[in-house]
Amino acid sequence: SQQELVLLPLWEEAAEKIQMYIDELTAYAPSLQQPQDPSNHHAMRIAAKKLRYSLEILEPLLGSPVQPVLQALEEFQSLMGQLHDCQVWLMELEALQDRKQLQEIRKQWQKAGLGCGWASKSLQAAIGWLQEDRRLAQAKLLEEAGWFWHERLEEEVTNRLASLIQKALLRCPWPSEGRQRQLARG
């Protein structure tokens, strides 16, 4: 039909985009073994987000079998978001440890009549405690994210999703150059 002819290139482009997001997500997976790689952890979260949102848009075409993939992506995205929050906390607390920052706080406390000797030591102790708490949380979340990726999400993304995309492409009535490339990849 005329409508199918119009939609085919759009669907093929969407399938290529999804594959690109899958490739991007899997490329960041090794960073889950590297605790000191917050920029790639954040990039992996964003890649999961792009893939999830694209799949949500295409859910009517992919059908209910895409639900487990969407659920796994949402859970992973949440874990990675919590990990990112810990990493931001640690960066902010490190900046707060800076002597200039502490001196400024001390001055403001003196102006407020709160004194500074006990306050400075208390603040440093509180910062130290928060840093340790966030480091422990970061380590736990990174371990959980690594486990989740290897035990659940990797399978969903690389096998189930790839299969769903292939099945959807096969339902297209007319073969095209883009569709043949996509099928050859699978």
Where is each model-derived feature located?
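Cationic, histidine-enriched alpha-helical/coil surfaces that engage anionic ligands
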Residues: 1-186
